[in-house]
Amino acid sequence: MVSMLTNVVSGETEPSASATWTMGHKREREEFSLPPQPLITGSAVTKECESSMSLERPKKYRGVRQRPWGKWAAEIRDPHKATRVWLGTFETAEAAARAYDAAALRFRGSKAKLNFPENVGTQTIQRNSHFLQNSMQPSLTYIDQCPTLLSYSRCMEQQQPLVGMLQPTEEENHFFEKPWTEYDQYNYSSFG
C-alpha cells in the first residue's frame, strides 16, 4: 500500500508488480475527466445561464402539471371534502393556471393563493360581463320591454315553456293521484 502511494505521489504511472499482488487483486477505478471548458466571465456567464435555465425549466404554476404527451392538467383540493377536483386538460400551462385560479377563488375566496394575483379584479369583471351577455340575454330583453315590476311579472307569465322540458303524460299524472300504500307511508315517514 505504501509503495502504491509512493508511486502516485511521485507521478509514476505503472506500479510495480509486487505492490499490485501484495495488496490483492482489485479492480482499478477508471477516472474520466471532462475537457477543460473555456473560461467565460462577465455578463456572458449570466446570459448563458439564463438561456440554459429557460430552456430546461418551464415556469411552474400552482395546481398545474404537464402530461407526458405535452398537455397541461389542472386540479385543486376541495377544502370542504378533502378530495381532489379535476379542472381539466389544457393546451398551455397558463390556461391551466387560470382555471386553477378561478377554482381557488371559488373555494377559498380572498384567502386563495393564486398563480396570477394581479388579474383578480379584471378576471371578475370580464367573467361577469361575459356571463351577463351570454346567459342573461333573454331576461335583459324582457326587462327592457317591461319597465315596471308589475309589467315584468306579466311578461314572464306570457313566456313559452322552456324547449326540451318534458310534460308529464296522462299516465304519469294519474301515478301521483294514486293513494299511498302502507309501505309508501312507512318509507315516507322514515325519511321525514
From Swiss-Prot:
Where does the source fall among the domains of life? Eukaryota
**Any idea where this protein resides?**
Nucleus
Q: Which InterPro entries match?
A: AP2/ERF_dom, AP2/ERF_dom_sf, DNA-bd_dom_sf, ERF_plant
According to the entry, DNA is bound by residues in 60-117
Which cellular component appears as one GO term in the record? nucleus
Tell me which Gene Ontology terms the entry assigns under biological process: cellular response to heat; chloroplast organization; defense response; ethylene-activated signaling pathway; positive regulation of DNA-templated transcription; response to abscisic acid; response to cold; response to jasmonic acid
Per UniProt, which keywords does this protein have?
Activator, DNA-binding, Ethylene signaling pathway, Nucleus, Plant defense, Stress response, Transcription, Transcription regulation
Which residue intervals make up region (Disordered)?
1-20
Q: What is its main location?
A: nucleus
Pfam families associated with the record: AP2 (PF00847)
The conditions that induce or repress this protein are given as: Induced by salt, heat and drought stresses. Induced by osmotic stress. Induced by jasmonate (JA). Induced by salicylic acid (SA). Induced by abscisic acid (ABA). Induced by ethylene. Induced by infection with the bacterial pathogen Pseudomonas syringae pv. tomato DC3000. Induced by the bacterial pathogen Pseudomonas syringae pv. maculicola ES4326. Induced by wounding. Down-regulated by infection with the beet cyst nematode Heterodera schachtii.
Query: Does the record's keyword annotation contain Transcription?
Result: yes
Q: From which residue to which does any coiled coil extend?
A: none
Q: Describe the task this protein carries out.
A: Transcriptional activator involved in the regulation of plant development and tolerance to abiotic stresses. Binds to the GCC-box pathogenesis-related promoter element and the cis-element CE1 (coupling element 1). Involved in the regulation of gene expression in response to abiotic stresses, possibly through the abscisic acid (ABA) signaling pathway. Involved in resistance to the beet cyst nematode Heterodera schachtii in roots. May promote callose deposition at syncytia which may interfere with nutrient import into syncytia and inhibit the development of nematodes.
Q: Which family does it belong to?
A: Belongs to the AP2/ERF transcription factor family. ERF subfamily.
Output this protein's name.
Ethylene-responsive transcription factor RAP2-6
